[in-house]
Amino acid sequence: MSLEVNIEKKLDGFILRAAFSAGNTPTALLGASGCGKSMTLRCIAGIVKPDKGRIMLDGRVLFDSEQHIDLPPQQRGAGLLFQNYALFPNMTVEQNILCGLKAEKDRAARQARCAELLRAMRLEPLAKRYPAQLSGGQQQRTALARILAGRPRILMLDEPFSALDSYLREAVESEVGSLLAGFDGTALLVTHNRDEAYRLCPEMVVLDSGRVLRSGHTRDIFADPRSITAARLTGCKNILPCTRLDAHAVRLTGWDVPLQLALPVPEGCTAVGIRAHDFVPCDAGAPNALPVAALSSSENPFDWNLICTAPDGTARLWWKVSKSTLFSPAPVPPHFLCAAPESIMPLTN
């Protein structure tokens, strides 16, 4: 199955221009809050009408402004999980799921499908409970069961973990990951959390202010985000201004030190990205060695954060050091840090 999206929609402050494709592999839409991710899902589902463009699912046109095609939501085969799950509060778990089976006229078939979903989503003991009597994870499973009842051809999850307490997220995320991996169709996950996107989706689309900055394999995007915004969205803490020297070298501003890169440096390169875990202490003569002075440190349960500066104090970088145990002491501040050429990412504006 495949999804093709190429639409425009005028929003407050910017124009959404979403152009991407997705196949049978779970795909994340990663971006900051308000960048147009959720609106894109609503346009695909038929809840919101784009100003122009085209949406196709498995070769079937869902929306085409030029041909004046705009299928209603019921005919699109799209299942959309809202952030708040949108369960009917006065209906039981079983009744909520049956609402997703209204198109099935045969009562016995409806009951059989409902029973199948109750078993699959481990909701059988909760069938007669109301949403207010459920945990956040149970509410989510109920909402997913209702969506899956109609056998959608595309499954779209809008920030599915935002309403969950942190201690529940890991368990629920594992369940959602299994669901996405086993879903026989196109699956989209909207998130602003880079870790969720990386763990759950082998494919990714990065959006900023309504524009698609980068799309492709998730690992490829993390390794080479290409733009400063995409690098920040994927969690890169060190965005260091530079000038291009040649096809594989730059000079860092603040250090006046040349760095060698494995990736080609484009003509428009204005910065490099180096992830905080990719720095290692080194000697002054090591390749890509940067002289640093420790400014501050902070401790997390499983790593240390050190903020270092250039010798003149004008530029800063983050260095993350994993802890071997909970009580590992702070690392000794180094005089030099370096990063391998393969770990340095050329970035443009």
Residue ranges and their predicted role:
Residues V48-K49, M56, K102, A181:
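A position-specific signal in ABC ATPase nucleotide-binding domains
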Residues R54-R76:
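ABC ATPase NBD Q-loop/coupling interface
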Residues V5-P26, A32, S38-M39, G46-K49, ...:
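Non-catalytic connector elements of ABC transporters
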Residues F222-L245, G273:
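C-terminal boundary and immediately downstream tail of ABC-type ATPase nucleotide-binding domains
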Residues I47, A78, F82-F88, N193:
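Catalytic "switch" loops of ABC-type ATPases
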Residues R42-C43, E203:
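The short alpha-helix immediately C-terminal to the Walker A/P-loop
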Residues G77, T92-T229:
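ABC ATPase nucleotide-binding domains
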Residues S38-L41, R141-T142:
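ABC ATPase nucleotide-binding domain helices that frame the ATP-binding cleft
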